[in-house]
């Protein structure tokens, strides 16, 4: 347990960027229990609102990127909590099946006992008649991220699905590289493992100008038994 990371932690976030050339800025604040893997965040669009695209494509960059709030089961070293007080960064490319591409660069730091996130995002090639630009998405299904050590950090892959108005899904693939600001020689790296995520929107108002969302995340090994004794 990292003494700098308490059982209840506050967080603040600033996100700015563009989607299909449209500029915007969001801020958020929240709290949660990093050791239970639960967190709640309240997010406001402070520039460029109401957004002309679905807020859902931003949602994963607020909390699916809030990696300090993951419960790690026994035997899995916590790459993210070990990274403090220096913190960590991550870069992600999300490719949607309709051709849209969403990239994120995020920095996580610890300031006066509060987790502070700065995110730069860029979305391109989202079809004007697609679910994202028509604002016809209805939230993310739960998913599992696969993680393993790579290039001195962690590499994450996952397939995700957005619910769409009228039934059906818009699927996408996530590829994320996580890097600690601390040299990896100073802490224990985890091996191959998974993280289950459930990201839910609890509240929204004013045409998605204000959103409250909650996430529960747990790191684990495969639940299936191995004949070779592997985890």
Curated annotation (Swiss-Prot):
2-iminomethyl-5-imidazolinone (Met-Gly) crosslink, residue number(s): 63-65
Sites of (E)-2,3-didehydrotyrosine modification: 64
This protein's record includes keyword Nucleotidyltransferase: no
Alphabetical keyword list: Chromophore, Luminescence, Photoprotein
One GO biological process term: bioluminescence
UniProt-listed InterPro entries: GFP, GFP-related
Biotechnological utility: Fluorescent proteins have become a useful and ubiquitous tool for making chimeric proteins, where they function as a fluorescent protein tag. Typically they tolerate N- and C-terminal fusion to a broad variety of proteins. They have been expressed in most known cell types and are used as a noninvasive fluorescent marker in living cells and organisms. They enable a wide range of applications where they have functioned as a cell lineage tracer, reporter of gene expression, or as a measure of protein-protein interactions.
Pfam families: GFP (PF01353)
Keyword check for Aminoacyl-tRNA synthetase: no
Xref: Gene3D superfamilies: 3.30.1300.40, Green fluorescent protein (2.40.155.10)
PTM description: Contains a chromophore consisting of modified amino acid residues. The chromophore is formed by autocatalytic backbone condensation between Xaa-N and Gly-(N+2), oxidation of Tyr-(N+1) to didehydrotyrosine, and formation of a double bond to the alpha-amino nitrogen of residue Xaa-N. Maturation of the chromophore requires nothing other than molecular oxygen.
Protein task: Pigment protein.
Further comment found in the protein's record: The emission does not change over the pH range of 4 to 10. Maturation occurs via a green intermediate and is complete within 12 hours. Recombinant expression at high temperatures induces oligomerization.
Quaternary assembly: Monomer.
Family membership noted in the UniProt record: Belongs to the GFP family.
Name the record gives this protein: Red fluorescent protein eqFP611
High-level lineage: Eukaryota, Metazoa, Cnidaria, Anthozoa, Hexacorallia
